[in-house]
């Protein structure tokens, strides 16, 4: 877990400046992880349940690998951290490490958008960023299925953490104006809450920054005066515009709607 924001320190965990720094650092991580992913073909087979034969499982190869990875991660306390959200909560095991004692920072909530994140990533993001290698999927004995889903899982886990950081953003905004938000929450006015938390100028800055990072990180300046990016820059920007930003706001709104519950 990136430790730029100390979740054991409430004064930092809910400081919007520190949260913003964390989100910007995650932009770097996500961009590099996507660049790593596009080394491999789309390999659609790994997303089809039962297409790769797995003993005692009908899951897709991605889902099976992700589920097994989360089992291992849970043993080393990953999902005790409040900024981590499992894709397969039923797979988690008791950690072998003693628990960290986190202070109560967030209001109790049950928000987990990982199903939406995974569906958008596999259905929309991957087809738009993966290169056409000029061949069909050649099967598990010829394609790098293991490396493919390993790269996918790294992307998914960071995207999940980035999007669910909306809870910290929402709590920070609520603390700044508890009376104003309480009124909207009691009225059940999700649209007004969405308007209150939205800053179009900030969203535009994010998209411009993502475009610059995607192009910069995916080009070799030594190749030519105008090197070709290793990744579809427009597709990365679209992922933020159509998925990361909207789902982060959905997390914020859902969190605020639960903020006054017992």
Curated annotation (Swiss-Prot):
Domain of life assignment: Eukaryota
GO cellular component: a single term: cytoplasm
Effect of residue 173 to A: Abolishes catalytic activity
Pathway of action: Metabolic intermediate biosynthesis; prephenate biosynthesis; prephenate from chorismate: step 1/1
Keyword Aminoacyl-tRNA synthetase set for record: no
Quaternary assembly: Homodimer.
EC number(s) reported in the record: 5.4.99.5
Subcellular location field: Cytoplasm; Secreted; Host cytoplasm
Regulation: Contrary to classical chorismate mutases, is not subject to allosteric regulation by tryptophan or tyrosine. Also not regulated by phenylalanine.
Keywords, comma-separated and alphabetical: Amino-acid biosynthesis, Aromatic amino acid biosynthesis, Cytoplasm, Host cytoplasm, Isomerase, Phenylalanine biosynthesis, Secreted, Tyrosine biosynthesis, Virulence
An example molecular function term from Gene Ontology annotations: chorismate mutase activity
Catalytic activity from the UniProt record: chorismate = prephenate
GO terms of biological process kind: chorismate metabolic process; effector-mediated suppression of host salicylic acid-mediated innate immune signaling; L-phenylalanine biosynthetic process; tyrosine biosynthetic process
Organism: Erysiphe quercicola
Region (May contain the secretory signal), start-end ranges: 1-100
Function description: Catalyzes the Claisen rearrangement of chorismate to prephenate. May function both as an effector during plant infection and in the fungal tyrosine and phenylalanine biosynthesis pathways. During infection it channels chorismate into the phenylpropanoid pathway, thereby decreasing the synthesis of the plant immune signal salicylic acid. Within fungal cells, it acts at the first branch point in the aromatic amino acid pathway where it steers biosynthesis towards phenylalanine and tyrosine, and away from tryptophan.
Pfam families: CM_2
Keyword field contains Secreted: yes
Protein name: Chorismate mutase
Start and end residues of each Chorismate mutase domain: 7-261
């Amino acid at each position: 877990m990136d430790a730029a924001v100390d979740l054991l320190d409430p004064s930092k965990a809910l400081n919007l400046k520190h949260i913003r720094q964390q989100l910007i650092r995650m932009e770097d991580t996500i961009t590099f992880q996507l660049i790593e992913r596009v080394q491999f073909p789309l390999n659609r087979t790994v997303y089809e349940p039962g297409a790769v034969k797995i003993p005692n499982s009908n899951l897709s190869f991605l889902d099976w690998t992700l589920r097994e990875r989360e089992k291992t991660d849970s043993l080393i306390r990953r999902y005790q951290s409040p900024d981590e959200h499992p894709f397969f909560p039923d797979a988690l095991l008791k950690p072998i490490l003693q628990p960290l004692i986190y202070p109560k920072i967030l209001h109790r909530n049950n928000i987990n958008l990982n199903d939406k994140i995974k569906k958008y990533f596999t259905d929309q993001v991957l087809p738009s960023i993966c290169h056409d290698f000029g061949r069909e999927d050649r099967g598990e004995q010829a394609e790098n299925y293991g490396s493919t889903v390993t790269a996918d899982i790294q992307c998914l886990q960071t995207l999940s953490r980035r999007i669910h950081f909306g809870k910290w953003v929402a709590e920070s905004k609520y603390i700044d104006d508890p009376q104003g938000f309480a009124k909207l929450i009691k009225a059940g006015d999700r649209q007004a809450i969405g308007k209150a938390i939205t800053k179009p100028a900030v969203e535009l800055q994010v998209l411009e920054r993502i475009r610059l990072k995607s192009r910069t990180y995916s080009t070799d300046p030594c190749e030519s005066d105008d090197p070709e990016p290793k990744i579809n820059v427009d597709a990365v920007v679209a992922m933020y515009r159509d998925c990361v930003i909207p789902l982060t706001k959905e997390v914020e709104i859902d969190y605020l709607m639960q903020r006054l519950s017992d």
